[in-house]
Regions:
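Outer-membrane beta-barrel proteins
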Residues: 1-138
Length: 138
């Protein structure tokens, strides 16, 4: 992890899982940067499996904006690429969400709208969701 510039964080990690019958190599890279009321983030992961058609590539980014001390808005987007096999084509899961949150004293209220296409690499699994959350701190 690198944090030598104010507001900037960069990280890289990798590892190998050889506990199962097939070895899997994983790696991740990320960067976040906070400037004034904005925070930006980007992440990329890869999984390389010894099993044919099991590799995955993940990419995501997000941005948030603090309108003031109590109100913030954020947006995120991600893609997860599934490697195909000789009988299955490559597919990409896409997801996005937008959120808004407001804090007033010990109470917080947040709302999110999210969409996903090709969930788990299945081209007929699309969905959307909504959430409203109210939290109290005592």
């Amino acid at each position: 992890t690198y944090t030598g510039i104010d507001g900037l964080t960069i990280g890289v990690a990798s590892g190998t899982d050889s506990g199962g019958s097939v070895e899997v190599d994983n790696s991740t890279r990320y960067i976040t940067y906070a400037y004034d009321a904005f925070t930006f983030g980007f992440q990329s992961n890869s999984m390389d499996s010894g099993t044919a058609g099991a590799d995955e590539e993940y990419t995501a980014y997000a941005v948030s904006y603090a309108v003031n001390d109590d109100l913030s808005i954020s947006y995120g987007y991600s893609e997860l690429d599934y490697e195909g096999t000789s009988t299955l084509t490559d597919t990409t899961q896409e997801a996005s969400a937008i959120s808004v949150s407001y804090t007033m004293g010990s109470m917080a209220i947040a709302a999110t709208r999210a969409d996903v296409d090709n969930q788990d690499g299945d081209t007929v699994k699309d969905g959307e969701g909504y959430e409203i959350n109210v939290a109290f701190t005592f």
